[in-house]
Structures are given as C-alpha cells and as structure tokens.
Design a protein with these regions (language model features):
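N-terminal glycine-rich phosphate-binding loop for ADP-containing cofactors
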Residues: 1-538, 548-581, 588-595, 600-602, ...
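Extended, composition-driven regions rather than compact fold-specific motifs
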Residues: 543-545
Length: 801
C-alpha cells in the first residue's frame, strides 16, 4: 500500500502530546489534539456564564495545555503561525473524528489500564489500515495490543519520541511480534525523511534502548561521583563538551528532565529487571537523588534541584550548585583537572577519550570507572535490547546528544586498552567481546571504501550499516580529499561535485577558510560540475569571521590590512555568487556574521531545519561588510512593487541587522528573507550534504549559466537616511540605545540606503560593497567597538557601551 500521512490525531495533550502535535504541525501535517473533558466548571467559567456544554469548558484542558506548550522555551514550533494547523477537541465529543485521520498516536498518562481502555475505543472507531502507535516510554508495547482486532494489531507499534521532540533526534520504533513489517519499514522511513529523526529499531524490552542505557549511565555516574566525593560542578564539567556531550552534563540534565521523571523510570527498570537483569540493583536510586526527590527538589519544574537560580544583591541571576555535604546551595566554583588541561589542544573529541582514561588524577579515575561500568553493561544487553551495536550507539547519540555512542567511544579508547581497564576494576564484559578479539577483530567499527561497517555478533563478521546510501558522511571519506590546508578540506563526493569542509575552531572564516573557498571554486570550475559547502560539526556551520585577527589589526591600527582582508572576503563572497559552477551551501546549527553572508551569496541554500542564522556584527560594534548589508539592500530592491511603501520593506531588513537578530529556525529565515523560494529546508541533519549535492547536480543538469553582477539595485539615498536617522535619534532620546549604538546604526542606515545620493536610484553591487567596507573600517577605529570585541573575545558578552 502506498501510504501517506496528511492528518495525525494525537491523543493526550500533556507536555509530550502537545509538543509532538507541534512538531507534526512543523512539517505541514494537519493535527487533531484531544484530551479529557474537565470534571467541573471553574470559577472563571462560571463568572462568564459558560455552561458544561460549551466548547470553551469541554476543551479547556487541551486548549490550556497547547497554549502553554506554544509559549514554552525553547519554542516547539518553527513559526508561531504553524499553530493554526492544530485543531483541538476532547475524547467525549471528538474521538469519532479519528476515522478521517491517517495516524493515531496515544500520549496519555503512563498507566496500562488507561491506555488499554482508550485503545478499545480507538479500535471501534478507526478505519482499517490506520496507523496506531503509542509514545509510552516504558510500558510493554505488546501488553497494550492485547484484546485488539487483528487489523489493529497489524498496524500497531511503539513510537517513542524524546523530549523535546522538535530538538532531540531520537525516535525509537518498537514493533510487537504481530506488527506488519511494512508498518515498521514505513515508520522507520517516515521518521527519518519527514520528521527529521534518527529512527532506531528497538526491541520491546524495559526502557527500550535509550532509557535503559541512558538512565543506567546517569545513575551510575552519580553513584561513582558520590563515592569519589566529586562536586556537582566537577561532574558536569567532566561529562560535558570535553567528552563530546551537551553542556548540561549529568546533574543539569537531571534538573532539565525532572528528578521525578528519572526516579520514575529508574524504579520501573528496577521492578521489571527482576530475574532478567544481572545489574538490576544499579537502578536503585542513589541516596542523594532520593533525598532531593523526597524534598520535592525536582529540578527546573520545582525551581531547584542539583542547581538553583537566585538573584544576587544587584538583581542579577546567579546559578548556585548543591553542596552534598550540607544540602545547601553555593556559587559554582572553577573546575580544574590536570587531565582536562591535557585535552585542550585536542579538537577532535574522539582523540580525547584515550587521554581522559589515561589521566592519573581524580578525573582520570572517574572516566575509567564510569566508562568501564557502562561499557560492560551495554555489552551484556546484546541481544536482549538490540541485536546490533550500531543501533545502541544511534539511540544514545540521538537521544542524549552525545557525539559518540558507547561502542564508538570504546573503539576510540581502544577495545583492548579499555578491556584491560575493565579487568583492573574487576568488571567483565560480555563473552562476545572476548570472542571478537580472539578472532583478530580489534574494533567494533571499520570504514572501507567510504562505507562504515559494524561487528555483527551473530555472524561474527563485519556488516555494512544499513541506510548509508541516504547519507554522505565526510568522516568516512578521508581517502577522497583532493586538497586541504590548516582550515579546510576539499572532498570529491562523486558525480562531479566537490564538498568544502571547514575545520577551524567553530568553523570561523580566517585566511585558510577563504583560501579553501577560492580553491574549491577554482577546482570545480576546472574539473568538476559544482561545489557544496557543508560540514558535520555539532557546534556551527560557521561562527563567522576570525574576530581575534580583526581585533589584533584594529588595536594596532593596521587599517590597510583590515581593508585588504575585508576586500578579499567581499571578493570571495562575490565569487561564490558569480562563478561558472553552482555553489550550494548546507548550513546547520549556527551560521553567524560571515557564515550568514556566505549563505546569502550561494546559488542555493539547503538548510537544516534547526539553523540559527543572523548578521550579528552590530553586537561587536561593526556592520556586516562581507556583502551582507549589500545583499539585504539588493533583496529589498527585488521586493519593491509599484505602490509599495518601500522604506517599510527596507526598515525590516535594517532592524534585523541592527538588532543582530538570529533566527530560531530555518523557517524563520524565510520570514527574514535570508532564505528565498529557491532555497530548501531539510528536516534530517544527516541528509544535509547528500541533499545539497543533489541540488548542485540539478542546477548543473539544468544548464547552469554564470550570472552577471547586478547594476539595478534600487536604493533610497538621502530620503531613506534621513528617515532612518530620525528614528535612531528617537531611540537614543528614549534611552533604548547608547550613543555608540546610534553611531553604528547611522552607519548602517547610510550604507543600506545607498549613501549620500540626492534621490532614489539604481546602483551596482560593487558600489554598495565599497560603502560597506568604508563604514566597517571607520567603526574599527572606534574605542567602544574595540571594547565590544574584547568583551566577546574574553568569553563574556560585549558591553553595551
């Protein structure tokens, strides 16, 4: 059957239900969100004369839940307007409406009796062939299907999203023995392609994959930390970015998730593990967690947990950390370990792991104990929770935001090396690990001919990870590098397309990266058909220009050097726009300043849905001068139509730059006019480079012709400058901005309006680029601009001087 999903019904509007509904709305699906009818009228409803039959009363729970979710931070919707795609109702009046829906997803309270009762009603109302899934995080899927019709059971499956579903990539697909294989295949594909998820096939076992191993790792980390006397700050430092994990580390993660949630899952895993899990006692909640739980110090939801946010005497927010010895909160301290110092020069996280476990201080001991324990446990869970190691790694990476999964981390340390550490701690992994090594296989993964293989335990051979044909992984293509320097690699990714990867810190655009862009264009024009600019960084597509270099030149008053650097940057951006081959960019995460300008000059942008892009130069006392200001003037000019109030259109672009606005999604970039109709948004980050490559191929196949530079950009001249400056003066008078803000804004107004022209007229791109560069240079000579740059470079926020 050729299945498509146009309408989804979500049953249950709690935190997860409402957020899942929002994410389906993000992808353009029509959503029906249902919940129970309230027990009785509240005082506000009585005062308004609302009756028990009125929809405002009957849908109060679902409407309140949805509105609360929409207002949450981070936002669950790509754009607030997408909320119109969600229709609300209640189980009593609207459950029969599910007949018209393609997928019905249950997200009610975690009680088997309630779920089974609801599914009995759903079974009687659904049309045959409708997908039915549950978002349970722990109730056995097969138990929910008991007593249901044959057609229901064939189309029933677990679909476990991680919270928040917009941002966390994991979607576990958990079939029962009766689930039709075509349904499993469809959900795996749909979750990947349309929802942007890493879909992981999981067995119907307690906690599935991610929670089983993730909660084990969290609790054991807390237990080891308590035994070693490590503080909250120390543990979160050790389990944060230095180990390729989110900044939240361990304790902050617990506060975000909610201690009650963690305790609930741990207790369930303990109960369900009786007679089945040799390490069942590991799920006994540690004493410190139990104390916090009993005190109702549950984390963010209760206002305090392992951390607490308070106001200091100056009214400034301060984060305090719990002192385990006193159960009082104290200011976070600076964490320093010799082992961590030894990793500062190692940018590749995978190369840090061996250094971390080799440390001779308490940090090294912590890593050895925690890694050894979780690796042992993971090895023993095969084949119980999964038959394949790669699914375990995918679940942990996508569910918890780790750059490397458990077996990938073990590989990076060295399987034999880690085994020695485990044995020194009297820990013994599964027998299959010893068998693998005895057969001469010394790693869990291999890369051959650009494809990654995993060690398959059942066959005792290496097998290719399925689904790789949908992705291009640069980390697998080291043999395909055709040119490189200290800041960039150029890969031949096949079919006549090159890919330029930045590899500087935060992918900032210094001289090596600029050289790489020019080299990529030159090689592509000579021997290839197109150029993709994309990378696999977890931090940034590009955080912009190399501010440290610019600051150094400005301090030394090397204005000729600055002029040369900016002119070269502008020329490179223009070359990306006006080369003889298509240039396609693939932004994701952060694309700031110069990183944004590069995308503005591409023939096509293939952006990940979670792209946070903006022209942010104003914040450090300058204006965009890599063609960003010019490009926004050009795009506004293209939007002018007869009868338009042109200055209103231009003012929006001006404000986006003056406020250093950064998008909260790729969809918002469309609304900001940073993405255009020709550009594309991709939901699954893993597909980004392959989609960008396909876009470059299509442009080439369709007869790409080298564009001509524009000479028809309409600017407003003195009229526009005067109006903008009047507004700036009013802002200054009202004390909304500082004198220096006003000075920068006036420079921006001058450039974006085309300078000192007597009347509105058409100008060239180069004319605007020259204005940009002139304004940029003058601002680099300002003391307050240098203070802003220095503030950012010192790791803080630029002062609002």
């Amino acid at each position: 059957m050729n299945r498509s999903i146009r309408k989804v019904a979500v049953l249950g509007s709690g935190i997860m239900g409402s957020r899942i509904a929002c994410h389906f709305a993000n992808i353009g699906v029509e959503v029906l969100l249902l919940d129970i009818v309230p027990r009785e009228l509240n005082d506000a409803e009585k005062a308004k004369g609302i009756t028990a039959e009125h929809p405002a009363f009957r849908n109060r729970i679902v409407n309140d839940s949805l509105q609360q979710t929409i207002k949450a931070s981070p936002a669950p919707l790509y754009s607030p307007g997408f909320a119109s795609r969600i229709k609300t109702g209640n189980f009593d009046d609207n459950l029969a409406d599910i007949k018209a829906y393609d997928w019905v997803m249950e997200v009610v309270v975690e009680r088997l009796d309630i779920k089974k009762s609801l599914f009995e009603k759903v079974d009687a109302l659904r049309k045959p062939g409708t997908l039915i899934t549950s978002n349970t995080s722990g109730i056995p899927i097969h138990l929910m299907a008991e007593g249901r019709s044959d057609d229901f059971r064939k189309h029933f499956c677990g679909t476990h999203f991680f919270n928040p579903p917009r941002y966390l990539r994991l979607l576990e697909i958990i079939p029962t023995p009766e689930t039709d294989q075509s349904i499993v295949d469809f959900l795996m594909h749909y979750g990947d392609l349309f929802l942007g998820k890493t879909t992981v096939l999981s067995k119907d076992t307690p906690g599935f994959i991610a929670n089983r191993l993730g909660i084990y790792a969290l609790i054991q980390t807390i237990r080891v930390a308590a035994e070693m006397g490590l503080s909250v700050d120390e543990v979160d430092k050790l389990t944060g970015p230095v180990a390729g994990r989110p900044k939240s580390g361990t304790y902050r993660l617990s506060d975000v998730v909610g201690l009650d949630t963690t305790v609930h899952v741990a207790n369930n895993l303990y109960s369900s593990g009786e007679g089945k899990d040799e390490s069942r006692d590991a799920f006994v909640v540690p004493e410190i967690m139990q104390k916090l739980y009993d005190n109702k110090w549950l984390g963010d939801k209760s206002g305090q947990g392992f951390y607490k946010k308070v106001k200091d005497e100056a009214g400034k927010s301060v984060i305090l950390a719990l002192d385990f010895s006193t159960l009082e909160y104290k200011p976070s301290g600076k964490v320093k370990f010799e082992t961590l110092e030894g990793t500062k020069a190692i940018s590749d996280v995978s190369k840090r792991f061996a250094v971390l476990v080799a440390g001779r201080d308490r940090a090294g001991e912590f890593y050895r104990k925690t890694f050894a324990d979780i690796f042992k446990y993971a090895s023993l869970r095969i084949p119980e929770i999964s038959d394949e190691i790669f699914r375990i790694d995918q679940a942990i990476s996508a569910g918890f935001g780790w750059q490397y999964g458990l077996f990938e981390t073990w590989d990076a340390i060295g399987v034999k090396n880690m085994l020695s550490i485990m044995e020194s701690l009297d820990l013994k992994p599964a027998a299959w690990v010893y068998e693998m090594l005895a057969a001469g296989n010394e790693s869990f993964y291999k890369v051959e001919n650009g494809k990654r293989s995993y060690y398959d335990i059942a066959s005792k051979t290496y097998k290719k990870i399925p689904g790789q044909e949908s992705f291009i992984l640069l980390s697998n293509l080291s043999d395909n590098i055709v040119w490189k320097n200290a800041g960039a690699n150029l890969y031949d990714i096949g079919d006549g397309i090159l890919n330029l990867e930045f590899k500087s810190k935060m992918n900032t655009m210094g001289s090596e990266v600029i050289e790489g862009i020019n080299k990529g264009i030159s090689l592509a024009e000579k021997d290839f058909r197109g150029l993709v600019i994309g990378n696999e960084s977890s931090e940034a597509f590009s955080a912009g220009a190399n501010l440290a270099m610019l600051f150094m030149f400005a301090i030394e008053q090397e204005f000729d050097e600055i002029n040369m650097v900016i002119a070269q940057f502008q020329q490179t951006m223009m070359r990306a726009r006006y080369s003889s081959i298509p240039v396609v960019t693939a932004p994701h995460t952060l694309a700031l300043g110069g990183g944004c300008e590069l995308n503005l000059h591409a023939d096509k942008v293939v952006a990940h849905a979670e792209t946070y892009m903006g022209l942010v130069e104003f914040g450090v006392g300058i204006i965009p001068a890599g063609g960003g200001t010019k490009e926004m003037a050009l795009r506004c000019s293209d939007m002018y139509h007869a009868g338009d109030t042109e200055l209103n259109i231009l003012q929006t672009a001006f404000m986006n730059i003056a406020q250093a606005k950064v998008s909260t999604s790729a969809q918002e970039l469309r609304e900001m006019n940073y993405l255009q109709d020709k550009d594309q948004i991709v939901l699954n980050r893993s597909r980004l480079i392959v989609e960008a490559k396909q876009a470059a191929i299509e442009l080439a196949d369709n007869g790409y012709t080298q564009p001509k530079q524009r000479n028809d950009i309409k600017v407003q001249g003195k009229t526009g400058i005067a109006l903008f400056m009047a507004g700036i003066a009013q802002m200054r008078l009202a004390n909304y901005i500082s004198d220096h803000d006003a000075k920068i804004a006036n420079k921006l107004a001058y450039v974006i309006n085309g300078g000192d022209l007597s009347y509105a007229q058409n100008v060239t791109e180069q004319y605007l680029l020259d204005l940009e560069r002139e304004a940029f240079l003058s601002l680099c000579g300002e003391k307050k601009t240098l203070e802003r740059m220095q503030g950012l470079l010192n790791g803080g926020k630029p002062p609002r001087n």
